[in-house]
């Protein structure tokens, strides 16, 4: 299944039915008076979060969704039947944005959560409502109101507690294979991972958290190089960032500079994102002789000026992986408990995530506009640099997204 994380959808709520003008016609009841019923209410349009889908691909091909129009009123003061509400299933983690106002209508982050996105029109009034002492036989009835028409953007961000970041081939996919049942593709070439992969890290005794493997970043990603920041937005919902650094790159590059590239790209793309708690993971320690390992790791940490938590791992063999799992689980549990016990902290966390998502959305759109402008200028013969990021609808890769329980 193709992984599609954005779609622009037009939704139309149902129109209300018309009220009617009719009169009571019954034997032995002369001048029976008005008995026109009201029109029914048009169906609303909702989105509902479901856990059996993890892509918006259906909305890439079917872009218009209309609720049915309600019935008109009937005689004998019978109202028309209202039309059924329309429910559009979306993956958990979908944000609904009004394209005209850029207003975020809501986030769907729980199974079964619903959100009203277009309200159906009310039914018109039958002529019974217009009877008065001076007008015993009104012939007036009103039409039903139109349902709301909206053009909305569905944005999917994976819901994960921990986001894996790093250069291509830093060992992120191997790491998530070690700690969960997810089986992303692993190979010895860059950009093996083309879409986010989710894995549930099960510690046991009902203790677990979700980890997201994000496609590798390269220098200039914040400006569109490589895969750009197309998938960087998926770490906007995470509580922690796990920064994997290959301490012995096969291309002979400097691991310190490689780490700085990621830190700089994060900061350039979103300072709020760069301020998320980060853990530095010095990976592939099995590729360095034991007598050189401690000196190399100490050098990397010192050169980066890193004052946070540092782990050493060999993801291929699993060495050091369990320590990271348990550390993350303990930290996440403490944070969850504090959010429950401390309303002020919970509100601050919510505000931080809202700021982060707003900043990520703004920067993503800005980059897309810059890309479109560059592409237009290139077609017109202006010498502007192009890049590999494509914000259009035809840049999707036919790849699979893996969501393993």
Curated annotation (Swiss-Prot):
It is found in: Cytoplasm. It comes from the Bacteria. Residues 371-382 have a biased composition (Basic and acidic residues). The keyword Kinase does not apply. Residues 383-399 have a biased composition (Acidic residues). GO terms for molecular function: GTP binding; GTPase activity; magnesium ion binding. SUPFAM superfamilies: Obg GTP-binding protein N-terminal domain, P-loop containing nucleoside triphosphate hydrolases. Mg(2+) binds at residues 173, 193. GTP binds at residues 166-173, 191-195, 213-216, 283-286, 314-316. GO terms for biological process: ribosome biogenesis. Residues 371-405 are annotated as: Disordered. Residues 160-333 form the OBG-type G domain. Its cofactor is Mg(2+). GO terms for cellular component: cytoplasm. It holds the Pfam family GTP1_OBG. InterPro entries: G_OBG, GTP-bd, GTP-bd_Obg/CgtA, GTP1-OBG_CS, GTP1_OBG_dom, GTP1_OBG_dom_sf, OBG_GTPase, P-loop_NTPase. Belongs to the TRAFAC class OBG-HflX-like GTPase superfamily. OBG GTPase family. Monomer. This is GTPase Obg. It comes from Psychrobacter arcticus (strain DSM 17307 / VKM B-2377 / 273-4). The gene is obg.
């Amino acid at each position: 299944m193709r992984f599609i994380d954005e779609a622009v959808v037009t939704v139309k709520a149902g129109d209300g039915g018309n009220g009617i003008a009719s009169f009571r016609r019954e034997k032995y009841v002369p001048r029976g008076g008005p008995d026109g019923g009201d029109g029914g209410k048009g169906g609303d349009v909702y989105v509902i979060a479901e856990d059996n889908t993890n892509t918006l691909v259906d909305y890439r091909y079917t872009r218009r969704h209309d609720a049915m129009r309600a019935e008109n009123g009937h005689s004998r003061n019978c109202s028309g039947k209202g039309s059924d509400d329309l429910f559009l299933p979306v993956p958990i983690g979908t944000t609904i944005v009004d394209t005209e106002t850029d207003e975020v209508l809501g986030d769907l982050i729980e199974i079964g959560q619903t959100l009203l996105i277009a309200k159906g029109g009310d039914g018109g009034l039958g002529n019974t409502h217009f009877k008065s002492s001076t007008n015993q036989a009104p012939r007036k009835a009103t039409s039903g109101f139109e349902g709301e028409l909206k053009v909305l953007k569905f944005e999917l961000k994976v819901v994960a507690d921990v986001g894996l970041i790093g250069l291509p081939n830093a060992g992120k996919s191997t790491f998530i294979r070690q700690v969960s049942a997810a089986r992303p593709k692993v190979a010895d070439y860059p950009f093996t991972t083309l879409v986010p992969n989710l894995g549930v890290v099960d510690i046991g005794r009902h203790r677990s958290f979700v980890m997201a493997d994000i496609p590798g970043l390269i220098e200039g990603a914040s400006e569109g190089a490589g895969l750009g920041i197309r998938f960087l937005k998926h770490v906007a919902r995470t509580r922690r960032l796990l920064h994997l650094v290959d301490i012995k790159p096969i291309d002979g590059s400097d691991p310190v500079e490689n780490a700085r590239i990621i830190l700089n790209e994060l900061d350039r793309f979103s300072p709020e994102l760069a301020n998320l708690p980060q853990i530095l993971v010095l990976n592939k320690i099995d590729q360095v002789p034991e007598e050189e390992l401690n000196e190399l790791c100490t050098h990397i940490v010192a050169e980066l000026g890193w004052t946070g938590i540092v782990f050493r791992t060999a993801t291929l063999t699993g060495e050091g992986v369990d320590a990271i799992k348990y550390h993350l689980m303990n930290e996440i549990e403490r944070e969850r408990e504090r959010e429950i016990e401390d309303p002020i902290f919970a509100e601050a966390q919510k505000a931080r995530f809202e700021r982060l998502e707003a900043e990520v959305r703004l920067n993503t759109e800005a980059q897309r506009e810059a890309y479109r402008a560059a592409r237009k200028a290139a077609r017109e013969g202006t010498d502007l640099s192009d890049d590999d990021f494509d914000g259009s609808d035809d840049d999707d890769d036919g790849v699979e997204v893996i969501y393993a329980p």
